[in-house]
């Protein structure tokens, strides 16, 4: 049985940066907190907890404490509240996401901003939270806010960094007849595009596909969806313990793709379980 691991599997630049920054802070400072999960992966969150980093869900008054802003970013109000509450802020927001902030704020001056992304995702909330006016957020071409869209004369469309090109194109096709002046600024990151390009070929070349990553991970979800549409024998697992023996019976090749927040050791454990003993 041949096991083929995607070249783009595993951590993206922004995730690795946020984790490395957090570990360094844990070594240098005593009271270190992170608002929410630093990334969407339980193994990473657990490892950081063991190093002394405490996760909080709400900002409360603090003394001599450091607050890490997660890789997905956060609204401006979150930064302001943390400073008022006494925290020293260390911003681990992915630089690619910060670049989206800059683009969105610039475009807002003369456009209605439309975000193609998951409405409840931390990254999308962070982007929306940089703007003076609440943007319109669209998840799929099936949930267009038509009444609001028909009032828009000029719009700039930006994208959550992990969106698929197929979803973006489908939404843009629906928006073009509605909005007179419309321009797309595709702000999906390079790693996302690379992973999604690779996952379009791997399912054709392997008997089954394993997608490894958290069920809360947006980028992993999209990798799974793309692969599943091509190869029905695509399975989404978080760790090796979720492997089913029936999946690999009489299989000659297995393709593996790990999400952008999946540690290498998790992927390697899956590979070890798959190899015959």
Predicted regions: what they are:
Residues 1-277:
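The feature marks the mature, well-folded catalytic cores of soluble enzymes
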């Amino acid at each position: 049985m041949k096991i083929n691991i995607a070249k783009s599997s595993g951590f993206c630049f922004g995730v690795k940066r946020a984790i490395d920054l957090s570990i360094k802070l844990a070594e240098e400072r005593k009271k270190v907190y992170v608002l929410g999960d630093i990334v969407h992966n339980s193994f990473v969150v657990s490892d950081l907890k063991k190093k002394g980093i405490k996760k909080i869900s709400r900002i409360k008054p603090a003394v001599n404490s450091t607050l890490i802003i997660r890789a997905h970013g956060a609204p401006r109000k979150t930064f302001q509240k943390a400073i008022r509450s006494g925290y020293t802020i260390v911003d681990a927001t992915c630089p690619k996401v910060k670049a989206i902030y800059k683009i969105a704020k610039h475009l807002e001056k003369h456009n209605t901003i439309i975000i193609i992304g998951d409405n409840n995702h931390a990254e999308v909330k962070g982007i929306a939270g940089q703007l003076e006016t609440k943007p319109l957020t669209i998840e799929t071409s099936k949930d267009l806010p038509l009444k609001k869209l028909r009032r828009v004369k000029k719009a700039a469309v930006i994208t959550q960094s992990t969106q698929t090109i197929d979803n973006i194109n489908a939404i843009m096709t629906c928006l073009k007849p509605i909005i007179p002046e419309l321009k797309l600024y595709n702000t999906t990151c390079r790693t996302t595009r690379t992973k999604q390009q690779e996952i379009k070929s791997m399912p054709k070349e392997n008997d089954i596909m394993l997608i490894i990553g958290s069920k809360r991970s947006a980028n992993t979800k999209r990798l799974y969806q793309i692969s599943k549409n091509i190869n029905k024998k695509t399975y989404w697992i978080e760790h090796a313990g979720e492997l089913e023996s029936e999946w690999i019976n009489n299989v000659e090749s297995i393709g593996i793709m790990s999400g952008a927040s999946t540690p290498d050791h998790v992927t390697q454990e899956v590979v070890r379980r798959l190899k015959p003993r």
